[in-house]
Amino acid sequence: MKKIIRRFLLPGLAVLATGIALSQDRSRKGDTRKYALVPVAKVESTRPPSLEARRFGPDKLIDGKLPANGWRSTWTAWYKDNPTLTFDLGSEKTIGVIRIFFQPWDRSDELAQVKVEVSRDGVNYVDFNTYAGFVSERGEGAWAEMDLRQIKARFFRLSPKFQGWGHLWGEVEFWGIKK
């Protein structure tokens, strides 16, 4: 048993800790990209927010404020409600990173995946990538970071999938690449 722990568990925990530490840092060794936060002109959701959080529409995702008290101050989509959120940046931008501040409630891995689609005109979307592996302490907020490398688009459509209680999102950020 000790052999298994030394061989698999300890290296796995080291990789996980490194990933968490790097997820909050914009600069990485070998990555020469310089970032700037890009304002979002408009955000829309295919479904309204749920229950008591109904008063917090998707515009709460781009107000620059992290939630203070869980689902009572976040954009929330409840159990089995997988909406699509469309973000309009106002004009074409070169985006390197998208970050989502999420709060797991029922399971630490509640945010199972996020599908990212991009468009230049808001009509014709192209699948860009699907990101997974977001984990945080239950009841604690964390940033899910998606590296887009360098994609130029005006519209970004995010389609999250849950595996648990639902979606509690406090903020979504788009980080553009400076020239």
Task: Give the location of each predicted region.
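Bacterial N-terminal signal peptides that target proteins for export
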Residues: 2-9
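Hydrophobic h-region of N-terminal signal peptides that target proteins for export
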Residues: 13-22
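Disordered, acidic Ser/Thr/Pro-rich linker "stalks" and the adjacent N-terminal cap
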Residues: 24-92, 103-110, 120, 127-139, ...
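A short beta-strand element within beta-rich, extracytoplasmic domains
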Residues: 94-105, 158
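Short beta-strand elements bearing conserved aromatic residues within extracellular beta-rich modules
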Residues: 114-116
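Short, surface-exposed tryptophan/glycine-enriched loops
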Residues: 142-154
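Short beta-strand-plus-loop segments that form exposed binding edges in beta-rich domains
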Residues: 159-165
